[in-house]
Amino acid sequence: MDGNGCSIGTHILSYKPKSVRSDRDLEPQTHRAQCAPPPTCERGNAFPAKPRAILVRMDIKTRNIATHAADAPATAAPTPVVGRFAPSPSGRMHLGNVFSCLCSWLSTRSQGGSIVLRIEDLDDRCKRPELATQLIDDLAWLGLEWDEGPYYQHDRLDLYEDALRQLQDAGLTYPCFCTRAELHAASAPHASDGTPIYRGACRDLSAEEVARRSALRAPATRLRVPAVDDLANDVIEFVDRTYGAQCEALATECGDFLVRRSDGVFAYQLAVVVDDAAMGVTEVVRGCDLLGSTPRQIYLQHLLGLPTPHYAHIPLLMSPDGRRLSKRDRDLDLGELRTRFGTPEALLGWLAGQTGIAPDTTPRTAEQLVEHFSWDVIRAHRENITVTAQ
């Protein structure tokens, strides 16, 4: 049990917010690739406790290690929509981050839902309190209000540890000693998110070999995925609200993946799954560069007996020279944008017009943009969007 009232033994869903704030909110992400045809998700529907059309070919009963969720009634009453903003304080927000946050906020508010703000600061480069404070100030300036939080991942390590222990106790993990250089040197094919597909070099090491290697360097921890011939479990299918039907064979298109790095930092896939469930998130809106992470997260959700939210990935914003906007390159960062536009209404109105959310670039508040927002519009503009300075 952590300070938020979250328990991760056999389940993670007893969440009680330790504080409720009515400041302002957002979650940055700005990415996008090209994916698939539009889905038919209805606005306002939330997945019930037992996801139905998400894992079409995954036999939950044979691999779920927390069966309470798998046994939940499929006809449970719809739950309130809960969206989230999950920025990483690795630098100043840029325009792509603002776009991601805006879409998440508009989608949730258009369904009468609430927003959770979570600061994803597990990585050392994100442990900069001054950047987290700046990020929160920027979200407040934009007028995107949140209802719970901010919560910080560095305060939630016990939850991730408990989830990892469940996987370990079920025999689903193993120590991996492969270095990043070794993985890239193997010239292995890459997963959809650019990481090398792991071919299982450390999967079947003997106890003696594990002990020998552990004396030399700390291992990472990998999660086993179903074997390629395990057709009942290997293929993950889901429907993305923007890009439609998605399908991934874990063994051949992903491989066993990290749940904890060798430096002890919990992997993004595990932490985000635990947090989304604990916070009751029913809708995840984020950049399309994270579309490839979704099958791994759904696999983890089912192993841990957690609900699967709706997923909606959005286009990436690109610079005129074809580059993806990035914090590192300080592309259209919010400091510059605040100076240039002067007011949040001017910035949001211009962004909404550039991305097709609104019919023009008339200055508008976030609240005024709710009536213009539609996932049909996002689907119609699902290719990368090139933006130019005002």
Annotated model-derived regions:
Residues 47-91, 110, 115, 211-212, ...:
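Non-catalytic terminal extensions that flank enzyme cores
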Residues 181-326, 333-338, 387-390:
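Active-site cores that bind ATP or allylic diphosphates and position pyrophosphate for catalysis
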Residues 59-191, 288-289, 293-306, 364:
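N-terminal Rossmann-like or analogous alpha/beta NTP/dinucleotide-binding catalytic cores
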Residues 17-19, 28, 35, 43, ...:
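Cationic, low-complexity basic patches in intrinsically disordered or flexible, solvent-exposed regions
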Residues 11, 18, 22-26, 39, ...:
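Low-complexity, intrinsically disordered segments with a bias for serine/threonine
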Residues 3, 13, 21, 35-38, ...:
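Short, low-complexity intrinsically disordered segments enriched in A/P/G/S/L with frequent Arg
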Residues 7, 13, 24-26, 32, ...:
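Short hydrophobic targeting helices and cationic amphipathic motifs
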